[in-house]
């Protein structure tokens, strides 16, 4: 998301692994191309990325994608109870403040333990805080920034195109195709329609600066 509230593709890299070194290299490449003012990074529970964020963007906040968080909890829940647990988890993120969400999370943890779902309770207890970072931002942005759904259209498009081709002679040819599709999607409504009103964020940041 750029400063004007439009979605923007910052870059793509070939053969990147999920370790810290790869993420640090990618982030530093983006910085070298002029990236600055990063306020929030949203992602799944990738330790390599988390460690890299702390090193390259020490002042940037991290939001764990709530959808990935739910899936992680569901992995230790019987299929027969997934629907009810899903409602419980969504109730946490339906609260109107971080304090209320924390209190709701405590209640959910207690309820999960009462349901004999100790592993699920532990996952919620241990991981809920990093899913609540979005509460530090303007309320109207919450549904936009608590998941990484913003890139799902890109991922679907990339998978669709690469499956058609099947195999590539080398990594560079694959990267060229991916970048071509990213440029195409960026030129559609995905990138041309305003996604967020950034004036609220600017005002909130000004208030914080003034208070400091």
PLM region descriptions:
Residues 8-12, 35-37, 70, 88-93, ...:
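Short acidic, glycine/Ser/Thr-rich loop/turn "cap" segments at secondary-structure junctions
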Residues 15-19, 41, 62-65, 77-81, ...:
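A generic short alpha-helical patch detector that favors 3-5-residue windows
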């Amino acid at each position: 998301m750029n400063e004007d509230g439009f979605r923007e593709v910052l870059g793509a890299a070939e053969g990147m692994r999920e370790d810290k070194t790869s993420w640090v290299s990618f982030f530093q490449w983006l910085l070298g191309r002029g990236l600055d003012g990063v306020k929030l990074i949203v992602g799944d529970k990738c330790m390599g990325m988390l460690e890299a964020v702390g090193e390259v963007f020490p002042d940037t906040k991290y939001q764990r994608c709530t959808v990935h968080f739910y899936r992680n909890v569901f992995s230790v829940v019987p299929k027969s109870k997934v629907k009810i647990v899903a409602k419980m988890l969504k109730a946490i993120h339906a609260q109107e403040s971080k304090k209320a969400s924390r209190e709701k999370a405590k209640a959910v943890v207690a309820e999960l333990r009462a349901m004999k779902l100790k592993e699920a309770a532990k996952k919620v207890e241990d991981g809920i805080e990093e899913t609540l970072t979005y509460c530090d931002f303007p309320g109207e942005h919450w549904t936009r920034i608590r998941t990484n759904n913003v890139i799902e259209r890109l991922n679907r498009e990339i998978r669709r195109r690469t499956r058609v081709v099947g195999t590539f002679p080398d990594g560079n040819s694959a990267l060229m195709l991916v970048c071509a599709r990213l440029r195409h999607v960026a030129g559609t409504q995905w990138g041309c329609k305003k996604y967020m009103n950034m004036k609220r964020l600017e005002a909130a940041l000004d208030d914080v600066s003034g208070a400091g």
